[in-house]
Structures are given as structure tokens and as C-alpha cells.
Amino acid sequence: MNKSNLNIKNKTPESVVEVKDLKVQFQLKDKVIKAVDGISFNINKGETIAIVGESGSGKSVTALSLMRLTDYSGGRIVSGEINLQSKKNFNLNLTRLDQEKMRDIRGNDISMIFQEPMTSLNPVFTIGMQITETIIKHQGKTKKEAFEIALEMIKLVRIPEPEKRLNQYPHELSGGMRQRVMIAMALSCKPSLLIADEPTTALDVTIQAQILDLIKMLQRDIGMSVMFITHDMGVVAEVADRVVVMFAGKKVEEGTAIEIFQNPKHPYTRSLLAAVPKLGSMIGKKLPAKFVNLDVKSSDEHKNKEKISTKKVVEMKDTVNRTSSPLLEVKGLTTRFLIKQDFGRAGGNIHAVENISFTLQPGETLGLVGESGCGKSTTGRSIIGLTSPTRGEVFFEGVDLTNLNNKEMIQYRKKMQMIFQDPFASLNPRMTVGQIIAEPIMVHGLEPKLGSNSRVIKLLNRVGLDEQYYSRYPHELSGGQRQRIGIARALALEPKLIIADEAVSALDVSIQAQVVNLMMELQEEFGLTYLFISHDMAVIERVSHRIGVMYLGEIVEIGLRSQIFENPQHPYTKKLMAAVPIADPTKRKKKLNLMNDEIPSLLKPIGYEPEYVQMIKLGEDHYVKPFDGMKLQN
């Protein structure tokens, strides 16, 4: 290889990557967006650096620039250097390499894990084909050798039935499994630098802990450096050696993790830390409480502020009607999915939800928490009728919905609405915001076409958006704004029950706080009842009156929030608590020994019926499923 063509730079020996005064811009029709505006930092061998900030701060564009992927999305590196110490011991300025040379760098020297695995995986190739392609290209292995490495990587990231998964396609896996596939693919060639762009945002806490453990283990074994892009300060505290805080494309603060968390200098850093939901912040509180809002308008405004107000936890009003009959009563709900093999033969049933029961009072929030694949989303879809349950009863206002036909269900559908995890996927891209919100109003004949406009504008105002958003399309909105549209659409029919399925899991802390606070305000105003499905224990603790913990399709513990968080009994509940990252680097957990846990398959033979085990009552509203070595704690 001709060294004269490699743009070789002198660099500190221990530094894997050195970024100098990087500026990245996007040219729009009428203006230039300065996405990254003069950022500098370095990443040393074996070091983990976290780039933190809210949506739009420039952290993801910084990561994409290191891979030179901004070239494909309209971005342009206008100045600066990205110097890499390659595996072949060349010092390369990546800003000057062409895309052909960058293809040799990507996957081999630098790998990247993206936030959205479904858009990163090729839908027409199997998981095995996609992982082995990278291994064959960069390591020169045979197909058989590459397949063996791929199988080992799938096992490392704890995907159940690994041999089967390698022959499946991305759409056949859950979101959590797809993300683990992306991680396996990124680590398969043992890169010098792993860039992880929000890799655990949509994963539950135990899988998140396992992935963080896995990355740390590989980092130790091969001396890999890691660049974490995240808004989750708990993850930052758990993994980062150094932290770079970004706002409006600029670096506003840099320091060790302990310096940033214990003695943040910049007002924006202090406000970012204040907005982090903290597990245990509700001890002694009986009712849900709002989050602290982080209101950011400009970097200059932050520079001029000397103090950031950190409000104390303020409880909401008691909205629960405990004297009336339950609004929702679920009895023995069971949902199974038939899995077909070759030539349409029945291969077994997935026992997604297995014999669960609970009630919801008017004005109450029940938090349903558990790992990916535990059945919590299927529970919500089965209740509202998007998925047909196998058996069981769902009583809404005393009427068993499972016995109603489609025509009879119409009057109940408008009383129950759902907010989905991915607002972009659940909003029609061809419709304006006004049309999206007006659609259910028109379908149910609640307003004439002309009258619906004013109703839509009132709904927009109620979720914190003004009239200018009426004519916009979903792609013109931020993630937080799209989720507000989803809430406005859910409110359009004046429902009594809203099922929120991971409604805030992909939002950064400030937007998450705004959306959750809005939902609690609406509960106070309209007496709404929520089934709040989430894997985020800190959010669940903040919003819920009662909590149900799901594992392998069953509710294993249910009770008042204080009972679950202050006196958990089931081992799985305790495991969930232990896996939550704490936003304090001095309290980093040691390895949780979760990597060797086997994930039992939910696929059961045709005709299999599990033994029914009744829950044990521990106290008022507190129930637990019996478990091996059961010894209850006071």
C-alpha cells in the first residue's frame, strides 16, 4: 500500500482516534444547518468515551462523521480532521479518504451500532448471511468458519435458540433481538473502535445490563475503544471513563465521568443531570409525581444562567376512584400464536400471554413492566382487540369484550385508545397532522368535517402544540412532537382508557419528561385511566399507582408502587431492580452474572397446557407468584 496516499498524520501513540475542530453542515433550500460546529476530542486505546446531549445536539452526526456516513445523508465535513490509528498501524486522516478506502475501515477498524436495528438490517437476507458477510470480507474466513463465528457471537449476546435465529429474517425477531443481532455483527470483526449510537435505548434493563457487560468484556479482551452516543445518564455513569457534553453542535463541557457527575461546571450539564429520572426518588410518596422539565432554548441562554432550578418531587392529585366498579377487569387472559413449519404443518404455540388477571379503577395508572418478549405489549393489544386472545375475559365497564362482534365493538373502541412506541411508524406519512387527528373523529361521526377543524386545533393546543402544526406532515416533526400528535389522536375520541405501549422509551430525558408530565396532567383533567407499558423502571415508578411485573407471559408480582419498589418479593422483580443503571459513577455495579442466564423459549408443543399456579396474597393489593426457595421478606 502506498503510504503517500494515506494522508498520514503524526498522532499521540495511545490515541485511537483524534478529532480536531470538526465542522459538519447540511445545506437546506433556504439555510445551512451547522450540525457539528468545531468539536475536538480524542479517544484512547481501551477507553470508553460518552458523547451526551439531547436530540439535535449533534452527537449522532459526530458519530456518523467518524464513519463518513454523513456523505450519504446530505451532510458535508467543511473543515477539521478525524485521525485514526488503524489496525495496520497507519495514521489516517479519515476526512481525506475516498469512500472506497472507507469501506475497508468500516466494520474492520471502526464498527457502529445504530439505534434503529430494523432500518439497519437488510430485510431480504437472513441474520446469518448478514453477519457472515462482514466476517468473510474483513477476516478472509470461509463460509463455514464465518458461520461458526457468527453462531458464537449470537450466543454471546444471549439470543435464545441461536442456530434457528441465524436462518431467520429480521422481521421474525423482536426489537430487542434485532438490536442484539446488530451488536453481534458490529463486534464480529473485533474493531479498534466501536461506536454505539443509542444502542440500548429501546432495550429493557436486564438486556441493557447484559449488553453493557458484553461490551466491557470484549473491550477488556481485545483492547477495544468505545464511543457511546446516548442521552441515558445512567448508562453514561455505568460505562464512561470520560464524558463530552454537546449542545447545539458544540462541546460545552468535557471531563472524567466522576467530574461531570459530581461537579458539573456548565449550566446545561447541571440541568441535563437534574432531568434524569432516578430510581428510588418516589420512596415515601403515595401518588405519582411529575418530572423536572428541562427547558432549553439556546446555548447563549444557558451560558448566561448562573443557577438551574431543581424542583422537588411534587405529587399529583389523587385521581383514582376507589369506590366505583373497575373500569377494566382482566380474567385469565391467554394469548398464543400458532407457529407453522414447512408445508404449513403446526410447529407449536408461542405462549405470549398466559392466564393473567388484574383490574384497573377509573383514574388509575397500572404500570406493566418486564423484559422484551415477556408479553406486556401483547397484553395491551389483546385488551384493545388488535390481537385476538386465545381465551379469557376482558370486562370493560362490566361488558366482556371477548364476546362482542366487530359491530358491537365499535361503541367501545372509541372509549379505549392506544399510544404506540414508534410515533413515526404509527402516523400516516401521506396525511397532515390535522388529517391524522381528525380521522378518528370523522370515522366515528362525532363532528361534521367543518366542525372537526376547531376540535383538532383545541387538541393540538392541549398537547402543547400551536395551530401552525395543523398542516405539517409527520416527517417535519421531531420525535417528541410526533408523540404529542399520537397523544392528541388518542384523545380525539375522549376515551376513558389509554394503553401507552412504550410511549416514551425512545425519547431523550427532557422530551420524555414533557410527554410523561403531559399525560399526568391529562389524567388529572379528564380522569383518564392508563395501562402504562414500559421497560423503564424509573419512569414506571414515577407515573404508576400500581405495578405488575411480567415474566415469560405471566404476571409474577403485582401491587402498589411502594410495595413493588420498596419491598419486592419475586426474584425476577429484584433482578429488574438490580439491573437499572444508577446515574452515579461511584456506584457502578460489578458484573451482574446475567450473561449465562438461559432465556426459556415461549414456544411450546401443540396441546401443552402449563400447570395453573395461584398467586399468594402478601398484603392489601400485593400478590406474588410462588417461586423456588420462596422465603418472603417483610
What do these predicted regions represent?
Residues I77-L92, G392-D400:
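Conserved ABC transporter NBD signature motif
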Residues M67, I384:
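Helix-to-loop junction immediately C-terminal to a conserved catalytic motif
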Residues Q85, E145-K164, V399-D400, G451-Q468, ...:
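Conserved ABC ATPase "signature" region
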Residues Q168-L173, M177, Y473-L477, Q481:
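Conserved ABC ATPase signature
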Residues S188-S192, A492-K496, Q512:
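A short, proline-enriched helix->beta-strand linker immediately N-terminal to the Walker B motif
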Residues F90-N91, E163, A257-L328, K340-G344, ...:
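Charged, flexible cofactor/metal-binding loops and thiol motifs
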